[in-house]
């Protein structure tokens, strides 16, 4: 009882003591992005905009997600699951639900509904899973790996039995941090253009977002307003459908395209032979759906 009374007395004294005004509001949640903020402002972003973003309490290093980039990959996604009859039936239902935007995409870009649907199925299970990591944290953490301290934090987070060699890690980190900085700039530009709070956008640990899983530079280059509401929202199915079709058209999709050329076009979406062959197989099985 004596100890309890003493603790209460000390707590009252602490509460009565003066504290710096605004200390809680201005304290940075994470100091690892200071040099990154300087770079962004130097590259043309408004200082107030950048400071406001990075002082948000939800902004922090995405250590767990980014470490996945640097682990030995012992398994790959089971793409065969997407050709199961129950999954294909969901894809057929999706094609009926979004018949109009799919038809509009085919009219405007020449890409058949079954091809767009196949990509959406493999990417996000038709929008059911678009990722749960803050895109800002993922891209900022990768971009901040230009700083040796951040890079060491990522290295130490990787289990020893899953690590690349340190030389391989450094080489990959150099490539990834340059890529991520470009993606971060594109992401912030997109969020400003569409008046979206960048701290609220979730996606994959690689920084891809929306139903179509576009990376930010692809959003700026290829994303389209599919529902004619004056905005580009990759979490909206009509926008995602139009954006995928526009992307494929840009890389050479055309009417009556052969399988070999179709393979080359889709390979630009995801540089995996397994992925491309699965998309083409799904599209073939969906032919005739209306």
PLM segments and residue spans:
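Cell-wall glycan-active module
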Residues: 1-207, 211-213, 217-290
